Amino acid sequence: MKRIVLAATAAALLATNCFAESYIPFSYPDAAGGSTYLTGVRGVSGGPSDQVYISGVYTPLGSAGTQGLTYQGSITSNTGSWYALNYPGDGVETITSTALYGPNNLGAGIRVVGSYKTGTSAADIGVMYEGPVSGIGGTWTKLQVSGSINTIAHSNYGNLAVGNYDTQLDEGRAFVYNINAGSFSDLTFSGITPTSWTAYGIWQNPNGSYVIAGGFSLTPSVTGLDQGYIVDYDAATGLSSNFRAYNFGDNPVTSVVSHFDGITSDGHDGFNLTGDWIGAGESEEGGLAFFAHVGRSADGSFTAAEWLSLSYPGEGNGPTSGNTVYEKYVLGIYVPDGGVPQGYVATVPEIDPNSLGSVLALGLGSLGLLERRRLKTA
């Protein structure tokens, strides 16, 4: 995997050198040479603030299939408990891969979503697990949009899960799944009709309303202008509001692809997000991860974002991605020099609310957009 040099136009955005307070490796300890992808995080209710649930994906060395992962413990040190958690199937189909995303705290356990594959098809089929984090005694529910080729659930909160499905491989659609009703609906936006769009992150506000984050494209080409978005969602009406599109650095010329992968509250009335972006002149094999902060205006709309570019430090390291976020922590993957993808946790510096719209560099690196889960081929 080649190392990408930032285009001059993109590098010009990174005017200030600012480094994360810390980066720590955070991988499944039983990987034994395999790769670890961290995909989701949520705090443990009633516990210390550093206690979290993490979802992930583990690829055993030499295997083409994946296994789901869950973790419970501290986010500041890899000292908690890891569990391999795989969809068991219905006794008829042979399960070859499981991938888990977006855990949620149920008090006495967790709810985690994702997808699985069988030995007879390359298609992804959505799935949801509810029960102990260990997987012992829990229940599984298949999630599949009618008529879809692939269905992947990315995250869940409250009574909703969000994700993507496709009916043709070059166009993905975002869905909202009502867990209590067991029903799917398309996520749509007022005044905009994308050719392809995703829903990766969901947050439930204290008043019961939801905020969803992801990405969209107005062009049919996968190399077209992609943007991230945030939108409010009313579960009672199924309507969205306060849609706002984002380009990394607030510049669609130098950032041709921007995508939000995760969202969390900032503890006030704003949100912290993470994701990936690609600079002008780069292919989809190259780009960077980021951390972003978005506030609320007096009229309820979302503000401009403050952006921090992320890269796992180390001579010769390859790509870094931002997959999920909790408080001031970003989780994702990096590729060590000569190695396979591994998980990391980055602690980002405090946000200066007076510098919204600025871009700070947290190291420079490259990104292969590994396991982006953006439904281009899945």
PLM region spans:
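Intrinsic disorder/low-complexity segments
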Residues: 8-16, 69, 127, 175, ...
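A ubiquitous, low-specificity "background" feature that marks scattered single residues
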Residues: 8, 184, 356-360, 377
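Membrane-interface capping segments at transmembrane-helix boundaries
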Residues: 371-377
